[in-house]
């Protein structure tokens, strides 16, 4: 008996594996530090806005996310007509792949880039090409060397997940200048709100002055709206027009839309979250380093911790040890980092418990 057969390449895709979401045992407090979620939750104003429209769930949302695009435009000084919103930036990444990639094409991502990139690329029959990183950081020269006549798109997370590293804006501009004009450069700025470096830009200036670059962003991180699935993209009008032609007509719900408007306007909530993250990121990097473990310098809301390969001291051993204490971090074998764990910067209590736990783990307790 025959059955439907997936398109070529679909079954070659490794399914995305999210961070663990454990079910707490009775009487045990669990800290989920595996998905880069904010410990503060959404702005109270976003929750209030969500509730205000919750009595009208029978109505379809406004199909173009106009009120949200206008709020984003006001915040960043952008033309709302050059903005598109989606059910998380993941949806937008997939829409870009469907719009600009096909059988026989190639897209480039870096060694430890976000796993959605190869999934989106391979789902449309294109080939994902890996450009090697240097010190867990994007190497512009390696990307440029990977370009072939088949290259149609480059994915660049800046800052990168799961490494937490970034490249300066001058390097991003050098990358754009070195790419053929027909190659679309996608700048994924999901974690840009946490960066305080003077040489960093999320990429809006580059998008505004070119016809072949877009920048995507999300409300899942500093805004704390991951459950609502909201993202957006700023790009040239011709790219926005093309992507809109295949975008679902009601892809952002009304409650999500209004919660996002309130969230982006609550700058005090964002500033508080950014300052807390920076303080505890520095503290965690220093304290974990004192234990003899290497931490990759991060500009995001997480840190990447590297473990020895000695029996009893591995990342798997540490993961099991911490999980027993209700501390859930992210194992990274599927990112090609089998000896590392990624830790979301959590509450003060969670952060201190992780350091205490790692101290006991390294001491063999």
Curated annotation (Swiss-Prot):
SUPFAM superfamilies: PLP-dependent transferases
InterPro entries: Aminotransferase_I/II_large (IPR004839), HisP_aminotrans (IPR005861), HistidinolP_aminotransfase (IPR050106), PyrdxlP-dep_Trfase (IPR015424), PyrdxlP-dep_Trfase_major (IPR015421), PyrdxlP-dep_Trfase_small (IPR015422)
NCBIfam families per UniProt: hisC
Keyword Amino-acid biosynthesis set for record: yes
Gene3D superfamilies: Aspartate Aminotransferase, domain 1, Type I PLP-dependent aspartate aminotransferase-like (Major domain)
GO biological process: L-histidine biosynthetic process
Superkingdom field: Bacteria
Alphabetized UniProt keyword annotations: Amino-acid biosynthesis, Aminotransferase, Histidine biosynthesis, Pyridoxal phosphate, Transferase
Modified residues (N6-(pyridoxal phosphate)lysine): 221
Keyword check for Zinc: no
Family: Belongs to the class-II pyridoxal-phosphate-dependent aminotransferase family. Histidinol-phosphate aminotransferase subfamily.
CDD domains in alphabetical order: AAT_like
Catalytic activity reported: L-histidinol phosphate + 2-oxoglutarate = 3-(imidazol-4-yl)-2-oxopropyl phosphate + L-glutamate
Cofactor: pyridoxal 5'-phosphate
GO MF assignments: histidinol-phosphate transaminase activity; pyridoxal phosphate binding
Pathway: Amino-acid biosynthesis; L-histidine biosynthesis; L-histidine from 5-phospho-alpha-D-ribose 1-diphosphate: step 7/9
Subunit composition and interactions: Homodimer.
Record-given protein name: Histidinol-phosphate aminotransferase 2
């Amino acid at each position: 008996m025959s059955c439907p057969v997936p398109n070529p390449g679909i079954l070659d895709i490794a399914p995305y594996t999210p961070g663990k979401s454990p079910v707490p045992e009775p009487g045990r407090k669990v800290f989920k530090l595996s998905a880069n979620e904010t410990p503060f939750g959404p702005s109270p104003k976003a929750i209030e806005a969500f509730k205000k429209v919750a009595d009208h769930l029978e109505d379809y949302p406004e199909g173009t996310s106009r009120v949200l695009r206008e709020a984003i435009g006001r915040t960043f000084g952008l033309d709302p007509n050059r903005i598109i919103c989606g059910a998380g930036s993941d949806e937008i990444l997939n829409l870009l792949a469907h719009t600009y990639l096909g059988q026989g094409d190639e897209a480039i991502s870096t060694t430890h880039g976000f796993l959605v990139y190869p999934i989106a690329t391979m789902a449309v029959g294109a080939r994902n090409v890996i450009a090697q990183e240097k010190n867990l950081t994007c190497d512009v020269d390696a990307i440029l060397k990977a370009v072939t006549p088949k290259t149609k798109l480059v994915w660049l997370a800046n800052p990168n997940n799961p490494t937490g590293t970034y490249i300066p804006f001058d390097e991003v501009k050098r990358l754009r200048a070195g790419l053929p004009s027909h190659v679309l450069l996608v700048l994924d700025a999901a974690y840009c709100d946490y960066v305080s470096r003077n040489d960093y830009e999320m990429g809006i200036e580059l998008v505004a002055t070119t016809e072949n670059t877009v920048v995507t962003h999300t409300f899942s991180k500093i805004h704390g709206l991951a459950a609502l699935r909201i993202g957006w993209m700023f790009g040239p009008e011709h790219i926005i027009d093309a992507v809109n032609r295949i975008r679902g007509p009601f892809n952002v719900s009304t409650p999500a839309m209004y919660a996002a408007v309130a969230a982006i306007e609550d700058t005090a909530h964002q500033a508080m979250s950014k300052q807390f993250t920076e303080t505890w990121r520095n503290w965690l990097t220093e304290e974990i380093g004192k234990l003899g473990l290497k931490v990759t310098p991060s500009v995001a809301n997480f840190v990447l911790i590297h473990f020895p390969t000695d029996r009893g001291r591995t990342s798997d051993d540490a993961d099991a040890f911490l999980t027993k204490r209700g501390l859930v971090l992210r194992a990274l074998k599927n990112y090609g980092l089998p000896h590392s764990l990624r830790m979301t910067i959590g509450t003060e209590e969670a952060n201190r418990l992780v350091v205490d736990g790692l101290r006991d783990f390294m001491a063999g307790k």
